């Protein structure tokens, strides 16, 4: 849910005429409705934290974050589907067939409920409060408030939700490990997997300097021995796989989120991440993801979000 953040950036960097402003106001109203929809249907208990109901909603499909919740998904009998992803990309880099069995099982269950938002929260085979998703949503809500204020639209509901999120986000923090961890709502279990997405909290600008400093300290220990960073999973963890999709490789968007989040907290570290990210793209090409050990490019070639974020890093000096 990053639309509000992107739109705020567009408005900050461009001259907008009156006709465009009218259209943008309509877009902001639609974004506001989307955010209110997420709050209503993905956080029915009003905790300040929204759930994802399928690993695909996170964007990091086969992350080890989902291993335990997914193990509890009973695969549908006689399940039928055709994979195309492992035909165009090396299968060793892609999720396993058993992963897809579970993805499709979850999807088919949602389909049986006709994706009714009132039903799926309770009945989905997968229900996780993800740190990464909620970090992006918190930042988007903060940016949405700025947009609503700019166009004299009501911001009370979103403002109140931000306060609730700021308060309850801390329940996901582990003092000993100095990191945030997602929670499996369906099985009522914390997910103690060292994923780089746990550090997206820095992007959310959580109003807690003490925790932010501890997060940065922890992040600097994440994979210091590797030339390329950040690996999607901490390299010394048992679930780490150097080349398999979201189980180890470096993703440009993860670096981008953390670079942006550190700019007003540790500028030098932020610039280091920016420099290293630009270097790997210029040296290895615009691929989907890369090995943290040797920078080997993997996945799809000419990958658009790698290219788009490269442009953003190159053109944004602030």
Residue ranges of each PLM-predicted region?
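Extended glycan-interaction surfaces of carbohydrate-active proteins
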Residues: 47-128, 164-250, 276-318
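Internal, well-ordered domain-core segments that constitute the primary functional module
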Residues: 2-70
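Well-ordered alpha-helical scaffold segments within catalytic/enzyme domains
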Residues: 2-19, 135-153, 200-210, 256-267, ...
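Extended, well-ordered alpha-helical scaffold segments
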Residues: 18-38, 140, 151-170, 210-222, ...
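C-terminal transactivation domains of fungal Zn(2)-Cys(6)
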Residues: 113-168
